[in-house]
Amino acid sequence: MSYQHPTDLALVPELLALAPAEGKTFLAFNHAAERADGAIPAKYRELIALGVAFTTQCAYCIDTHTRHAREAGATKQEIAEAAFVAAAVRAGGTLAHALLSLRLHDSPEK
């Protein structure tokens, strides 16, 4: 069983119609965050988006941002490095939560 299927994207209009205010706000936010005229050049913006897509495991996002990164001039080497940066940050978050767990373990219960 696959949880994400390309045909699911055909349901986007229905999702937006079911929650029009939220959908409109989300699309406006998404377009603003992914705009081409920002301080971050398009290639790096797409590599950032791709790194996030790897950690959130969004197949649709990986598909879209891989294509956009390639179109913006990103190389396979840059994509590979972005993947390892994302993996390292994700692993760092795991260790940070381990520190929290150690502190909570040693603190008196409330």
Model features per residue range: what roles?
Residues 1-46, 96-110:
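Acidic, glycine/proline-rich low-complexity segments that act as flexible tails and inter-domain linkers
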Residues 60-63, 67, 91-94:
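Charged/polar positions within long, soluble alpha-helices
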